[in-house]
Amino acid sequence: MKKRRGVASYVVDLLQTDPHAQPQAPYIRPSSLAKGCLLYVAFELQGRPKPPFDARVGRILSVGTDSHRRLQRVLERDCIGQEVFFEVADYRIHGLCDGVLYIAPRKADEESMTGFWALEFKTAAAAEFDKVKAAGVPKEEHVRQAQIYLWGLGEYYRGTIPLKGAIIYYENRDTLDHLAYEVYPDPDAIADLLARVKAMLDGLAEGRLPDDVLPPEHWAHAYCPYLDICEPGQKAMAWQRVQPKSIPDQVLADIIAKRIVAKKGAEAMTGSKKKGGRSLADLAKELEWE
């Protein structure tokens, strides 16, 4: 019998193969690379063990997964694909983009909106969400992750999906409040990141770990799962411990709020307004929170 050839044969063969049963070299995940620490990425590629998540973190991740699925269901008729895979073997990077949105001309308010957009969904605690909202820009690592998707999808699909940019959609996991930002391709930024990846891969091939790490003041050192084996991270934490302490924003906000509430309660009890103190409206105006 003549062997079948062509696309139909390819699909038949593909469906007889379990991709998870095939031996695979470790690859870099976009979310890991987006952290900006190439030593962290190197540890992952080497398969260094991480401590298990505690139950609370597991529940938080589960909430994020549920939010992703809900948002994807809402957009299923507006996306050409969800969990869109890409792989770039030269840099050992692969991943799944949350979705590729298509805005049809008849649905666009402006002509510039029409076209294909990569989607990235992020769930955040209320305090983190408020910071992003107040800043008016997405977090640096989320911008970097969006750039990786734009580049990776372009490489893997060879430009057949002409992505105009990416949309980073934030959702407050406590209130379901939301906001979104547009991110456009930045060839210079992605070229710099890929050069760092190439240097890291070349070093690993020669048995060397990279010295491309986050600055000592970066908050991520305290949450790194590799801190026990990471000398730069341990030095960074030692440096942070001797720096002058400042009151965390959330703690300061709680203190101010409690004092204002106590003052209002005292006024209600005595029937007279206490002198000297500022109202919440005065404070908000002074701190430009309005």
Predicted segments with their positions:
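Short, solvent-exposed coil/turn linker segments
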Residues: 27-30, 136, 265, 279
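Metal-dependent nuclease catalytic regions and adjoining charged, substrate-binding loops involved
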Residues: 148, 154-290
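Mg2+/Mn2+-dependent nuclease catalytic core
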Residues: 84-202
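Short amphipathic alpha-helical leader/targeting segments
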Residues: 51, 133, 238-239
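Structured loops at beta-to-helix junctions and adjacent beta-edge loops in soluble globular domains
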Residues: 44-45, 122, 171, 227
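Metal-dependent nuclease catalytic cores that hydrolyze phosphodiester bonds in DNA/RNA
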Residues: 1-118, 125-127, 140, 244
